[in-house]
Amino acid sequence: MNRIFYFIFALCCLVPFMDINASEVKEGNKISGHVIEDATEENIAFASILIVETGEGTMSNEEGQFTFTNLTPGKYTLRVSAVGYQTSTKEVIVSKDYIAVIHFKLKLDNIAIDEVVVSASRNEIKRWEAPVVVSVASEKLFETINAPDLAKSLNYVTGLRVENNCQNCGFPQVRINGLEGPYSQVLINSRPIISALSGVYGLEQIPVNMIERVEVVRGGGSALFGANAVGGTVNIITKDPIENSFSISTNMTNYNAKSWEQNVGANVSLVSKDKSYGIAIYENYRNRNPYDHDGDGFSELGKINLNTFGLRTFYRPTHTSRLSLEYHTTNETRRGGNKFDQQPHNSDITEQTKHIINSGGIAYDLGWKGYRNKISVFASIQHIDRSSYYGAQRDPNAYGNTDDLTWVAGATYTGQMNKCLFSPATFTGGIEYQENRLHDVIIGYNRDMRQDVKIGSAFLQNEWDMRIFSLLVGARLDKHNLIKNPIFSPRVNLLFKPNKKFQARLTYSTGFRAPQAYDEDLHVTAVGGEGVQIRLAEGLKEERSNSFSGSVDWTTSFGHWQANILLEGFYTDLKNVFILEDIGIVDNNAIKERRNGKGARVYGANLDAKIAHGSDIALQLGFTAQRSRYKVAETWTVVNNEELTTKRMMRTPDYYGYFTLTSSPVKMLDLALSGTYTGSMIVPHYAGYIENDRMETTPHFFELNFKAGYTFILHDHIKLQLNAGVQNILNSFQSDLDKGEFRDSGYFYGPTQPRTYFVGIKITQ
């Protein structure tokens, strides 16, 4: 533990010595600007203005005006963006002899084609220019669907589906293109700090009021992120201090007229007048009572009491350098089962966890030569202290404790070249080291698991920009301590972009999954009155993948309407695919074993479409058609000495999708209709409540939601919004739930909540 902190401390000590060649800043150098709407010439307030070369940013005031002061003389590129408008970029020359004045006229854009993302190449780039398809879930989406946490948001990203895998504790998991959770990598500000343990309930422990946006890359895509991201990458970008502001909100929710939930959130952002330092703070409180859908006395949605707090701060020693710090803490208690007024060991079933999570990070960015060269040094750490009870039939020995420490450190370099072989190019390279130390003890299950995962990585990529073509070639070398030989993972992306309205992409990537414990291994499912554990088979080999994808992206406008259609095809081939087989009782414990199968293929198509008429009305929908099949039928259980097999991957529908429809029929009134569709799938149903194990085929589900909000302008530009609505209006919910203490808690599928009513208040400045 001490070595880790010494290493991070050493990185921090290097920071002050890395910008000794920074140019001297002279007083009086200034940019003064004005942002207006192109069609009406009305002022645009709260537009974001960024100096591309330095990363320094500000926001326009109520009159659309902005300033930058104390700048070093030279040429700068300003990029202006605002919600609902196309991004505009202009160059300006700063001199000590005069104030540079610049004006921006922004055109309406309600389909976000100019949105800036970082997950494609770790460098800021417009979404339509990115070499891979990047989908974005923004704060606007969170409000449209009234999502309290990340788990409730990801269903509204094409190709993603969030499911609840436990009837007791509510273990959520996100699938990308049909591949289960461990195939995907969840990042916080591009850092792989989410461990297997934090992945068990992590999607519900991240409140949306800490999130600026979520960027999703389906498939391997970029070599800069882990090669274990076979399914894709979910990159959570937290809120950064940009301007002085605050917000506070509260929301009351009722589940099917039976159970209540309360959410309270607050955000504060403070920035110095010269924009050289700032801090953004968030806090969230959530309290949910257990919900029993079928009246058997056992919960379908568990009790949650959650407190989160965090901050992100920065300091700019010079205009071309930035030091960033962040800290997050979570204190959560969740419990599912029955007899909530008694101790867990006095209940028939209880799955209970108490988490204390502390994480933090530091990063130092330095640019030079007009910011055409940049180096970033970073380190992040997370510690989890979990106490748990996964037991049934009043078992006094089902208590457990888990200690989990994850840390990552590294450095990246990015350089722009006027010519590399045959065209201008951007090179990115770096090194990264991450370690996870896990100790999980449950006496009643004879479990004392220690796992130490160490991964050293080096990566590089080069992107050639040939005007209408862009070619990105990259590779990553990973040395995993649980795998004998280093793993080389190449990635290739080709982008054809004849104009801003049409892009076509081709991608090839490889990846792997190591033979280690994943999130579901650290969760004990209650089946038939006893806990079921997962163990790794002897000689388990790493899983390898080869992925291909291609897409076409077309944007058009007609009159005041804008439209965008994205069609994407994907194919992933898995070798030594991991499968779970129920092997019965071993040493008085029910065991499922993770083994290597022959292989699998996952292929299909995603459709993403948007159409908008200004801010009056906007429709967005996503739909996925896919197949997830093993190459040969794999055994999943044995009943009466007969092996039950399946060639179809479990819990993966062939068809699923979503839609959102938003409208502002009158000023200050916002209406939203949204929904998700989940097609039929197969789900294993284990004996306990039923006599023998069997495979079930689920029905189709359609979840429909409605929300209305009205905003009042109070004193001094303070806004008050009142909102209310209904989620899952049709009460589309699983109808064949197991009941009682012998139920299979893993037999849980479909929408994650019943018909739900909510009302909320939000105050912002």
What are these regions (language model features)?
Residues 575, 677-686, 710-765:
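C-terminal beta-signal and adjacent terminal beta-strands/loops
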Residues 195-197, 210-212, 223-235, 239-295, ...:
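Outer-membrane beta-barrel translocator/receptor signature
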Residues 288-308, 314-375, 381-404:
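Flexible loop and strand-edge segments within Gram-negative outer membrane beta-barrel domains
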